[in-house]
């Protein structure tokens, strides 16, 4: 639905246009303007744990809805380089084109890689400042699993997850046990909702209060 709704919008925000997905519709002067707050919510979440992505290197696992939002917004935030990892599925070619377009638009080095190439993945994480899981691994039937092995972590890494149920995924727990700074998915969930509320009503959602009392 986030993808299909784009064609019904009168305008798209820069982020929504690059992502090809809308999660928030603003009615302004009789026009429907499509926004995507997922990526910005993710960036706000990692900034809240003290990580500024500008000029950094990131490895993002997953190129679906969440992954696309994450790596697109990171590029808009002017990171130095992004390694995107995904399985070679039926969307591989279209993802490759989207990644190339993003790189051309932002001037950021963005590349797509096969998640099954574990040696290459390990090398990418080794040179990265930020590691993001933007897949469903860690939730639902995949709860208790991780796409990342502990040996791939290093002491200069910040680890983030887009999964918010459970509150602490295996990846986040593993990173915490390793002594790393982490950002769980519930923060992204709340931040993207706060950005949507700001667009709709012009009000500031009490994110810290909600997270403390309801999660």
Predicted features, each with a name:
Residues 1-49:
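Phosphate/diphosphate ligand-binding glycine-rich loop within oxidoreductases
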Residues 28, 51-57, 154-155:
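Short helix-loop-beta connector
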Residues 34-36, 55-76, 86-87, 91:
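Glycine-rich adenosine-cofactor-binding loop
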Residues 76-81, 177-181:
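Conserved S-adenosyl-L-methionine
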Residues 79-106:
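NAD(P)-binding Rossmann-fold cofactor-contacting core
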Residues 108-182:
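Rossmann-like adenosine-cofactor binding region
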Residues 162-215:
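Adenosine-phosphate binding glycine-rich loop
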């Amino acid at each position: 639905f986030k993808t299909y709704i784009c064609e019904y919008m009168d305008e798209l925000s820069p982020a929504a246009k690059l992502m090809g997905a809308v999660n928030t519709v603003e009615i302004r002067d009789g026009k429907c303007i499509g926004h995507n707050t997922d990526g910005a919510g993710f960036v706000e979440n990692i900034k809240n744990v003290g990580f500024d992505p500008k000029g950094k290197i990131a490895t993002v696992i997953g190129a679906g809805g969440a992954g696309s939002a994450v790596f697109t917004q990171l590029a808009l935030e002017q990171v130095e380089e992004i390694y995107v990892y995904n399985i070679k599925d039926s969307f591989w070619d279209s993802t490759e084109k989207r990644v190339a377009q993003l790189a051309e638009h932002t001037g950021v080095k963005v590349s797509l890689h096969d998640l099954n190439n574990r040696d290459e993945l390990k090398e990418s994480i080794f040179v990265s400042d930020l590691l993001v899981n933007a897949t469903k691994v860690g939730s639902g039937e995949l709860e208790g699993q991780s796409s990342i092995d502990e040996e791939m972590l290093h002491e200069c890494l910040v680890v983030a997850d887009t999964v918010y149920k459970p509150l602490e995924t295996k990846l986040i727990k593993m990173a915490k046990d390793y002594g790393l700074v982490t950002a769980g998915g519930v923060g992204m969930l709340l931040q993207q909702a706060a950005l949507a509320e700001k667009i709709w009503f012009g009000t500031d959602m009490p994110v810290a209060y909600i997270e403390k009392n309801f999660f």
